[in-house]
């Protein structure tokens, strides 16, 4: 709502309107300010009657016949005494260099602001309107229209004389006119007409709707949205008219253009002025209301509405009631709405006031959001439009937002917003921390404090740590873990923790936190001691990370008690730092832990701990019998006699059997299996492993009077011992379980062996035949003999240099060649000849495959 001086009316109606506006949550679309400076001076002595607006200046007409040129701040730049009576209208061309003025006493002046007077005439009736050609500055466009009882078009001829033509008359006074391009629109008592100055034709007549209203009290408002769109406001009716070209086939005797009403609707109040705003309309309305107390009609504040025109109705976008000076005495005809197209400025003119309405910019939007305490939206709007805002700073809005959240008690949200708003400003961070301290909310801001860039004073971090230490051990521990140790004075915090431990020495949270502080302070010994006391999982990580092996040599038992697996792995991985001997010595009083260590050592390397293998026999026997036999099998350093003694003492049969067999006493081992274990399958398996005929004989002898053992032997020995030997020894009449099945199995095994042998024989014969054929094919191939070959005996060329001379050559399958005379004569026992070289090398004898003679 426009700023206004305080009114002394104190009317109920005005205060009601104000309260309604205050409660509205809808953001206004326009902002208002009173045009002051020179305008205030003028209106203190005179009253405004009309005004026109140019991009560069304003022209204001008064009831006392004065015309003032004003700058956009309202300062007077020029004054014209045109008439002693009311100025009815002022018109400017687009260049702003020429002005037309008409007054109630019939005077009309058209003159250049910088070039002097061009037209001056006094008519015999009041002239209500004047409009100069938009391009009046051009010599070809020296035209203007005036309106009183008739509409006259003045045009300067080629001899610099003005001639006039009547465009319209006979329908009452001309009360409004607007010139745009080649079209002139005017309103009289009957309606609105449009004239085309190019075709010299009147192209439309839009009749007025409500003829009951006096046209002098409720004048028509006209404005051109563009060169072809005229907006008409009269009474409570609004029409949007579009000027269109008529198709050539439709012209005949009709004008080349016609008007189509594209939108028509009624408003709630009487229209005093219209202006376009993009695709919307700005409407100045004269409002009359009825008092609830007196039931009399009174003049209320005028309204400035932004509406969206539709085809048959409209949508209200915003509506503002304007507190202009003297609105209680004004009539509908006293208000005017002028606008500047280039800057979207709207001037509400009344006799005692001129108010400027502007589209709200981003700064205004932020002002409204802050006023409504919508700080989050204001901050977002400022960030998005930070290049366009002039009056606001993002930081100031953010600080106001933080203060608002704190006042509302949303401490966590306020603290979280500090990260974004305060950024890297260390001074502001420290200021906000102290503010949170004053309200006892240091805990709220602690998670969001900067930890790197920027870094605050150590005192800030220490203050927060002390706050947590007094009331929240877990929170204190969390901060110590999360905050880098260089943010605060470590020794100060260590001392504070130790003071608290004096009151609660067994508090695990404080102990663990103290260990972490010691670690950061490189006091690893104290940290390790606490970790071991707490049996904390990070103890191994601490040892590895800081190479604390020298500190744990006397703490091996503690480590093993805490986590034997991790401890053993660590000790074995670092044998160079803690020797095997040292570990075994430390664990001497804890043989169960000693076994765990030595067992893992043996798994890694069978030879490293060989000196302890004898000890390990008793350790395995005591703590880990399942792994004793594998150990005995894999170890090459344990004393067998000692092992046998221990196993026999503990009656470990399987281990004793293994040791007896390993020491060569297989018969005793077999006997133990039979007598102690009574396991024929294991006995048979043992006999198979040893593959000793005497063992089989002992096994048969032991089993011959035990039917279950005989069954086991019959089922398993068929592939190692002739079953007949066992069957012949079975006593007559002895009942043997499953004998038939056992005999059938023996026969099946026997048949299977025969089939396997026959199959093998067939394969061997087939392979032999195949190889024989291959050898035959190879031996049947020819052998190349040429001059390069030599006799293997005399080493001379195998072929004579004289081809006519007779020769005899022998070539063996081994490819060695001899002169026949160089070979020894066959013996009496064998007529076959063999290669001397291959025979000398103990190779298989090769017989001659070719004998060449000539």
Swiss-Prot record:
Tissues in which the UniProt entry reports expression: Expressed in cerebral cortex and cerebellum. Highly expressed in Purkinje cells.
Compositionally biased intervals (Acidic residues): 14-26
Membrane topology category: Peripheral membrane protein
Phenotype upon changing residue 13 to G: In SCAR29; uncertain significance; no effect on protein expression
Region of interest (Interaction with ARL8B), residue spans: 1-540
CHCR repeats: 568-712
Presence of the UniProt keyword GTP-binding in the record: no
GO biological process: cellular response to starvation; endosomal vesicle fusion; endosome to lysosome transport; Golgi vesicle transport; late endosome to lysosome transport; macroautophagy; protein targeting to vacuole; regulation of SNARE complex assembly
Record key words, sorted: Autophagy, Cytoplasm, Cytoplasmic vesicle, Disease variant, Endosome, Golgi apparatus, Lysosome, Membrane, Metal-binding, Neurodegeneration, Protein transport, Spinocerebellar ataxia, Transport, Zinc, Zinc-finger
A single Gene Ontology CC term: microtubule cytoskeleton
GO function terms (MF aspect): identical protein binding; microtubule binding; zinc ion binding
Domain of life: Eukaryota
Region Disordered, residue ranges: 1-33
Zinc finger (RING-type): 791-839
Record's subcellular location: Endosome membrane; Late endosome membrane; Early endosome membrane; Lysosome membrane
Other notes: Protective against both alpha-synuclein and neurotoxic-mediated injury in invertebrate and cellular models of Parkinson's disease (PD); the function requires the AP-3 adapter complex and the HOPS complex.
Described purpose of this protein according to its UniProt entry: Plays a role in vesicle-mediated protein trafficking to lysosomal compartments including the endocytic membrane transport and autophagic pathways. Acts as a component of the HOPS endosomal tethering complex. This complex is proposed to be involved in the Rab5-to-Rab7 endosome conversion probably implicating MON1A/B, and via binding SNAREs and SNARE complexes to mediate tethering and docking events during SNARE-mediated membrane fusion.
Homology family: Belongs to the VPS41 family.
Subunit relationships: Component of the homotypic fusion and vacuole protein sorting (HOPS) complex; the core of which composed of the class C Vps proteins VPS11, VPS16, VPS18 and VPS33A, is associated with VPS39 and VPS41. Interacts with RILP, MON1B. Interacts with ARL8B (GTP-bound form); involved in recruitment to lysosomes and probably hierarchial assembly of the HOPS complex at lysosomal membranes. In vitro can self-assemble into a lattice. Associates with adapter protein complex 3 (AP-3) and clathrin:AP-3 complexes. Interacts with STX17; this interaction is increased in the absence of TMEM39A.
Recorded disease: Spinocerebellar ataxia, autosomal recessive, 29: A form of spinocerebellar ataxia, a clinically and genetically heterogeneous group of cerebellar disorders due to degeneration of the cerebellum with variable involvement of the brainstem and spinal cord. SCAR29 is a progressive disease characterized by delayed motor development in early infancy followed by difficulty walking due to an ataxic gait or inability to walk, hypotonia, and variably impaired intellectual development.
Protein name: Vacuolar protein sorting-associated protein 41 homolog
